[in-house]
């Protein structure tokens, strides 16, 4: 758990050689975690470079500020885009008369993004990091433009899918850029800074969306990305972003696409992911879980995924998701930990507003304000924990502490009732957010500090996929738990109220359909059902603590390569 084995080092050298055959792999017969290579002239062993490989020094000063500002704004916009549409959806469905399409406004983005994420790792591994990142962001902006000018519901769905394709490579690219710009001990602080500010987009999305919808038009929920995108373009266009690993030279783009991106693996993986996520989307909503459609989607996803695994095994280290990498304990535990943490975040982000709107009776805008304590404490701890990891070197204690505090915070949410005081729901949320913030970036730091540079983009892509996969799965489980619990609890606390009428009415309109004498019972049933959903989040938080133990005890300060010399290109 503490250090990389000799076998892993040999695997790393082989994978580096296969990924970049024109490069001489480093000599791996050494002690410790940092690979070494022998100089051609004097035979002196030197640390293998894990920073810029294009002769530039680490990025500092105003150039680093410009790069960090640019990628943070991009990640902020991406997370804003996932939540801003929620308050605009009623107005959109009214204009397009498209109530049956509501689910597709979110799932079109998710399906496109999740199916492309693993491929983005190979793209960043083989193409210029800066222009790959800018290209993904440009596709995201194109999707936003299509949504803004949409003349029909179908056009809006297509725009959301295009935006999802662009969004698939944004977070991966941001972490890859940070890895190439600064030395090891500075990465945790910058990663925490990026995640802390970017995640504000999740909470202010409904506020901004509600304001646009009420005072201008819902189209500005998408137009807002365009002027900010222009600012990002100016910040990044004139700044040189160093490469963390050498990219293939003298090889045509067509050759890279055909030989290095593992398109067959992508063609197998994408439909497997789409079928699985569609089954989760349809199950219990459009179709029953035991319907032929849902069962067929699950079976199709399973069969296609088996074919994908066999192909990846055949491809070996050239695969889209190399088997030898996923077998590394640090990698797969980091993926699982990040997935469970994101599941707790998404469950709370969806069901805390339901608690405030349905049970406390506030509007959508105010419910967004009421969940600020968890998001602000999460952002603050993300920044603080990242800085302290960079200062003291160890990420594992923060991940373990984050799992414990997040478990306690989610556990306290299960005590919510219609009469829970303001002080309690603020304090509980602060604790919950602090736990998430302390641990959220630790899987990324662990992967970056336990893998050779050529594998970092692939690992980041895998972690980002787990974010979508675990999030979608847990939200589907949460929906099943909430709906079934609400039916049962309504029979217990409000037996005279038909359960289906409450479910169909929705979280904000059921009060108008319930007799005054039955409302307290309905509110209690709603509250108990939300509590049961938070039990699911408790389980996910406990799992983050358990799997964090496999991420390794490592001092990242001892993994510092010498700073390259040379003039920085701009």
From Swiss-Prot:
Q: Name one GO molecular function term.
A: transmembrane transporter activity
Report biased composition (Basic and acidic residues) as residue ranges: 28-41
Biotechnological applications: As colorants, MonAzPs are widely used in various food products for centuries. Moreover, MonAzPs also possess wide-ranging biological activities such as antibacterial activity, preventing hypertension, lowering cholesterol levels, causing hypolipidemic effects, and displaying antiobesity and antitumor activities.
Indicate where this protein resides in the cell: Cell membrane
Q: Which Gene3D superfamilies match?
A: MFS general substrate transporter like domains
Keyword GTP-binding found: no
Membrane-protein topology: Multi-pass membrane protein
The protein's matches in PROSITE patterns, at most eight in alphabetical order, are given as:
MFS (PS50850)
Q: Which InterPro entries match?
A: MFS, MFS_dom, MFS_trans_sf
Name this protein carries in UniProt = MFS-type transporter pigP
Please report the organism this UniProt entry assigns to the protein: Monascus ruber
């Amino acid at each position: 758990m503490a250090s990389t084995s000799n076998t892993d080092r040999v695997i790393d050298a082989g994978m580096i050689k296969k990924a970049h055959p024109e490069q001489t792999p480093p000599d791996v017969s050494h002690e410790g975690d940092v690979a070494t290579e022998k100089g051609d002239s004097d035979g002196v062993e030197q640390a293998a470079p894990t920073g810029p490989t294009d002769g530039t020094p680490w990025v500092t000063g105003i150039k680093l500020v410009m790069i960090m500002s640019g990628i943070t704004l991009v990640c902020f916009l991406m997370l804003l885009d996932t939540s801003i549409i929620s308050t605009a959806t009623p107005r959109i469905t009214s204009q397009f008369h498209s109530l049956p399409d509501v689910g597709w406004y979110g799932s079109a983005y998710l399906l496109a993004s999740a199916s492309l994420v693993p491929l983005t790792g190979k793209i960043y591994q083989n193409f210029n990091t800066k222009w790959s990142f800018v290209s993904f962001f440009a596709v995201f902006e194109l999707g936003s433009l299509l949504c803004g000018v949409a003349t029909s519901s179908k056009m809006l769905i297509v725009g959301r899918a295009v935006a999802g394709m662009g969004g698939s490579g944004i977070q991966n690219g941001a972490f890859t850029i940070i890895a190439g710009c600064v030395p090891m001990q500075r990465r945790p602080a910058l990663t925490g800074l990026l995640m802390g500010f970017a995640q504000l987009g999740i909470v202010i999305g409904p506020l901004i969306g509600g304001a646009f919808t009420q005072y201008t038009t819902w189209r500005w929920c998408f137009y807002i990305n365009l002027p900010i995108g222009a600012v990002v373009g100016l910040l990044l266009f004139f700044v040189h972003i160093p490469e963390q690993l050498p990219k293939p030279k003298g090889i045509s783009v067509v050759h890279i696409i055909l030989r290095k991106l593992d398109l067959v693996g992508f063609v197998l993986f994408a439909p497997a992911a789409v079928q699985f996520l569609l089954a989760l989307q349809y199950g219990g909503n459009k179709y029953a879980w035991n319907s032929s459609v849902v069962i067929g989607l699950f079976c199709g996803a399973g069969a296609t995924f088996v074919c994908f695994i066999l192909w990846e095994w055949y491809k070996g280290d050239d695969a889209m998701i190399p088997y030898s990498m996923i077998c590394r304990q640090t990698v797969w535990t980091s993926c699982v930990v990040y997935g469970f943490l994101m599941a707790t975040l998404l469950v709370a982000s969806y069901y805390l507003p339901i608690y405030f709107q349905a049970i406390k009776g506030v509007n959508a805008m105010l419910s967004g304000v009421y969940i600020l304590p968890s998001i602000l404490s999460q952002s603050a701890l993300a920044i603080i924990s990242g800085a302290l990891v960079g200062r003291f070197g160890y990420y594992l204690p923060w991940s373990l502490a984050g799992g414990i505090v997040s478990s306690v915070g989610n556990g306290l949410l299960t005590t919510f009732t219609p009469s829970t005081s303001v002080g309690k729901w603020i304090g509980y949320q602060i604790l919950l957010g602090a736990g998430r913030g302390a641990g959220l970036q630790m899987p990324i730091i662990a992967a970056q500090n336990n893998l050779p540079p050529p594998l970092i983009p692939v690992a980041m892509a895998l972690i980002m996929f787990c974010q979508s996969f675990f999030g979608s799965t847990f939200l589907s489980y949460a929906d099943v738990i909430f709906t079934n619990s609400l039916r049962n609890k309504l029979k217990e606390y409000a037996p005279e109220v038909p359960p289906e009428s409450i479910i169909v009415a929705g979280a904000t309109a059921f009060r108008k359909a319930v007799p005054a004498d039955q409302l307290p019972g309905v509110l209690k049933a709603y509250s108990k059902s939300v509590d049961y959903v938070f039990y699911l989040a408790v389980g996910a938080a406990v799992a983050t603590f358990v799997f964090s133990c496999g991420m390794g005890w490592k001092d990242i300060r001892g993994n510092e390569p010498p700073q390259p010399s040379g003039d920085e290109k701009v």
